[in-house]
Amino acid sequence: MFQGFSQQTNDFLWGIRFNNERSWFEAHKQTYLDQVQAPLRELAQEVYQQFSARHQDLPLMVRVSRIYRDARRLFGRGPYKSHLWFSLRIAGEDWAAHPVLWFEIFPAGYAYGMGIYDAKPATMARFRQDMDQHPQKMGKLARAFQKQDRFHLEGEEYKRPKGHPKPPLDQWYNRKNLDLLCQREIDPLLYSPDLVGEVVEAFEQLLPYYRYFSDLCSRGD
């Protein structure tokens, strides 16, 4: 059962960031297993079980990241990650082109939200078309997003705007990809079992956006 992360969790993540080499990792591997990997897996499973039990119609699976970087893609970086995460997502190789619910822990804090990280241009074209033809649908979601204070909107924008819709759609229209995220510094919640409930509640808040973008993606499958 998830009991919270600990100061040792963050100490390890800081350590691996500044000592990203095999000898340091091997000397601190038990700390990683006990204070990072184990609680992250526990959190992932409990969030997944609670959320998927409420939404059995969603074809979700849970995946927890490994600390080892792909040796083919180091690009001058060390072999270990200092940011670790889990995700609730669809199965298949094309998962990054669909919305993903996620949680991430890093040395200075943690974050959670929903993103489409490798959105297909055709998906975002359907998104713009949907806003053009049915502005009330996304408009309702955009207004609800403006009224809340848990998440903020991020995502790469086109250098040349695709259009200039009126608020509140203007913040969404010209995105290449999307991330709705809550980012937090280290706080008591991170070290508490209550983190499970917070992440589940956050995913519930994001569910209308998850369903909306899942529908957009499925139209092209």
Give residue ranges: language-model regions.
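Long, solvent-exposed, polar/charged low-complexity segments
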Residues: M1-G15, N19, A44, F51, ...
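Short, hydrophobic/aromatic alpha-helical segments in well-folded domains
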Residues: D11-F12, H28-T31, G113, F127, ...
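Short amphipathic alpha-helical segments
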Residues: V36-P39, L43, T123, K137, ...
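A short, surface-exposed loop/turn module that caps and links secondary-structure elements
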Residues: A53-Y80, L84, D149-K162
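Aromatic- and glycine-enriched beta-alpha-beta binding-site module
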Residues: R72-D132
